[in-house]
Amino acid sequence: MTNITKRRIEAKMEKDGIDVETVDISNFLRNQEIQNYKKISSLMMYKDDYKCNFENSFVKNKKEKIYKKSFEDFCNNFSNFMNEGFGIYMTGEAGTGKSHYTNCIYNQMKDEYIVFKTSIITLFDEIFKNFGGMTKTDFLRNRLGKAELIIIEDLGNENIKDWGKENLYFIFDFIFKAKKPIIINTNLSDVQMEEYLRILGCDKLLSRLKSKCKYYKFDWEDRRIGMYKDEIDKW
């Protein structure tokens, strides 16, 4: 299988007068990768996360309605710009819906595209587990390179040491150079994110992110406050 050219299609064969159906090898292998990345991304998904979709999203204000429509448009038009490296950057306080809409996008895209949903900590854990089988840069290049959409959950919610900083720079540099579409959500403010990404003497990562990602600021109150009030009041 490893020597099969990506776009090769098996020729039709005829046996006993019966045509054997043509098999598109590239589609078969791609579908295998879709399933593989769904399994890998499941490390970041809880049972209720799979229930998130645009249809059951409860919109609380006008700005959120606009954001929701924009996220739906991103999914519906993804094939038109997937090779350009454009993406989404969500920032705001905890509980404002960033992870919900990230999961909505993931759930809509995961069966059609090779989507890699992860966090920096989860990705670093993968490096440690696979280190020895291949170098860390080869592992990251392989893991990120096959993905058609990369989702990084809760960026900035980790304490990164020098080893991690070097890898963090490689991750984003590879994503930019390979023109990989990326979705990021974070609780950090712009000032905090700029400081977080100011690694290895490089202060350009945030500006590069903003240049390729549409910016969404979730600046409303925590929507989880009072969410279970009716149930709790029944006690």
Which ranges hold each PLM region?
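Short glycine-rich substrate-engagement loop in P-loop NTPases that contacts/grips substrate
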Residues: 65-71, 106-146, 159, 165-166
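A structural signal for short, well-ordered beta-strand segments and their strand-loop junctions
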Residues: 89, 115-118, 183-184, 217
